[in-house]
Amino acid sequence: MNQLECLKKYTDIVVDSGDLVSINKFKLGDVTTNPSLIRQVMSLQKYQYIIYDSIRYAKKKGGSHKFKLENAIDKVSVILGSEILKNISGKISTEIDSRLSFNTNLCIERAKKLISMYEEHDIHRDRVLIKLAATWESVSAAKELKKENIQSNLTLLFSFAQAKICAEAGVFLISPFVGRIYDWYKSKSLIKSAMIDDDPGVNAVRKIYQYYKEYGYHTIIMGASFRNVDQVLALSGCDRLTISPNLLHKLQLSDDLVIRKLIPPKHKKLQPVCMSKSEFCWFHNEDAMAVEKLSEGIRQFGKDQQELENIINNNF
């Protein structure tokens, strides 16, 4: 049995890709996408029909050019997501414009719009996770969306403070970014050794996992942004792991032993009092890595969104 099959005994595996060919190859339940992946996919000739269909939809809806462009962008995500859902049994994670990350009301509005678009494709909201950057405002939006049976995937999660407010809000799922945490510490020459137990990204997820299970939080932990197979295997037993096609392929090629690394504690503790916004801001602000990587991630996804807008605008 290869490592991927062994890993699936302990952890739900998710494909981190927007490419239908890669997704179909691995036959897994769930898929995650983001603006970077969608921009890459939309640059391929075989997916140009999605852009043209989205523009036709936007023109039919009418309004100003800005409104049409916004509708076309969202429709691209929804058409691609709908195509992916035809080939999987689980959920698709679709991200809203990261430039809305500091406005709770706009996050809610855009999330509802995406869900409405999916429902136009006869996709039930239970099969869609709305991806939001894990800011205070976005977590607040996720808490409100939950009341309307719209579940969220809080992404760009780097700090323990972010993990705490997500758990306290009862969000459906979080995506701590293992590789990007590792990158920051490596760039600062702050990693003690090459041993996986000294990997700060791996240890961040281990800490969150232990805390969530110890205090009985139901939010799903999905490790993301892996740089190598060792990081993946070090988190075997995590609720979910979203993995790129390249690393999934490497796992398939190996028959080495896979040992479960994350095991929930037997005894539960009473949950602490929820943090206030000011407490969260200070707690998060104390983590220089998290502050830098969250800001960088939001900017990068915003840049990818802008580039996708340019592609669509040139086809109007």
UniProtKB/Swiss-Prot annotation:
Reaction(s) this enzyme catalyzes, per UniProt: D-sedoheptulose 7-phosphate + D-glyceraldehyde 3-phosphate = D-erythrose 4-phosphate + beta-D-fructose 6-phosphate
Taxonomic lineage from the root: Bacteria, Pseudomonadati, Pseudomonadota, Gammaproteobacteria, Enterobacterales
HAMAP family from the UniProt entry: Transaldolase_1
Q: Name one GO cellular component term.
A: cytosol
Against InterPro entries, the record matches this protein to: Aldolase_TIM, TAL/FSA, Transaldolase_1, Transaldolase_AS
| Name of the protein this chain belongs to | Transaldolase
Subunit record text: Homodimer.
**Which keywords belong to this entry?**
Cytoplasm, Pentose shunt, Schiff base, Transferase
Q: Give one Pfam family, short name only.
A: TAL_FSA
Where exactly are the transmembrane stretches of this chain? none
What is any one GO biological process for this UniProt entry? pentose-phosphate shunt
Instruction: Give this protein's Gene Ontology molecular function annotations.
Output: transaldolase activity
Q: Which domain of life is it from?
A: Bacteria
The family classification in the record reads: Belongs to the transaldolase family. Type 1 subfamily.
Major location, coarse class? cytoplasm
Known EC number: 2.2.1.2
**Biological role:** Transaldolase is important for the balance of metabolites in the pentose-phosphate pathway.
Keyword Cytoplasm on this protein?
yes
Q: Which residues form the active site?
A: 131
